[in-house]
Amino acid sequence: MKGRVIVLDHVGDMEAAALLVDGKLDDILIDHSDAPRPGAIFRGICDRPIKGQGGMMLRLPDGETGFLRQGKGLRPGQPLLVQVTGHAEDGKAIPVTDRVLFKSRYAIVTPGKPGINVSRQITDDDKRDAVLGIAHDVFDSAHGLILRSSCETGTADDIAEDIVAMSALADAVLSDAEGKDPEALTEGDGPHALAWREWSRPARVETEAGSFEAMGVLDQLANLEAAHVPLSDGNMFVEPTRALVAVDVNTGNDTSPAAALKANLAAARALPRALRLRGLAGQISVDFVSMSKAHRKQVEQSLRAAFKADPIETSLVGWTPMGLFELQRKRERAPFPIELFRSL
């Protein structure tokens, strides 16, 4: 199977979307948690400041608690619009930000940050001018607007419709900012909406019930239960612990002088996908095969290139004195629900 295929289906009663690239599972989105989705917007009520951290705990609907990292100048009881930025770890508050965005396939509306900006990924000057022209025709707001890279292949009508819809949503939500009680204002996008929003490159779309089984998605999901990840040169094990995600890279049966570098480069290229499919994030520690310091730069360059193409924000922290490489990855997704999947 060649090319890109987006598969929209359900796993049990859970809405799910899969992205296949040349038949290989490249990304998976499953709505398996009752927690607020990333992107959901609430009117929160400031509860108590976190001394020494500068943060603020907020009351959210349904008894949930949010944590705002920058809470300076806020007072208990004050209403505040906040947006969920990721999934909370067990026993911790939901991470939120007061920098609310309204994001769709073609447009992002940014309240409090005026101006119209076009994605740098659109490099053709004529296309940039055309996209800006569409925006100026339909966007008359004090909010800011970012035109996403997907505008390059979108039609003028679709782009204009997206801009108008996001602008109207922003106005509606901001008008409901005041109130004494916490309230859910938007739900955040589910897997099917997220697939439409984020997987914008040309692809065939399958929507028939049972497509996950017919397209081989279920078989590939079953493989995620194993920590073992085969590589073109060697293998690696990706294992989450309570404190961090541990990654161990091995050369396999190859004992040639170049084996270590080949295995490490293969692991660097494969790591974003392995983390993405498993929904793993937080602190990540990679134990590469022992190599010379001269080869470390090559591996680090390969890591940077691989994560640049990954949709989830990841910071490459660097090498530790013991030769491990550390990364910090944003918790945008919950871990893949292998227990739920096993029971189906």
Model-based region annotation:
Residues M1-A35, A40, E89, T97-A142, ...:
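Extended, charged alpha/beta regions that create polyanion-binding interfaces
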Residues G3, G63-E64, P76-L80, K103-Y106, ...:
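Short glycine-/polar-rich loops that comprise or flank the Walker A/P-loop
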Residues R4-V21, D26-L29, A35-H87, A93:
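S1/OB-fold single-stranded RNA-binding interface
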Residues P36, A40, L68-R75, G91-V96, ...:
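Ordered, soluble secondary-structure elements with a strong preference for glycine-centered loop motifs
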Residues G54-M56, A88-D90, I94-V96, V100-V109, ...:
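Conserved glycine-centered short motifs in functionally critical loops
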Residues Q70, S149, F288:
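Short glycine-centered, acidic/aromatic-flanked micro-motifs in structured strand/loop junctions
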Residues L80, K180-E183, E198-E208, N253-A258, ...:
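Long C-terminal interaction/binding lobes of large macromolecular proteins
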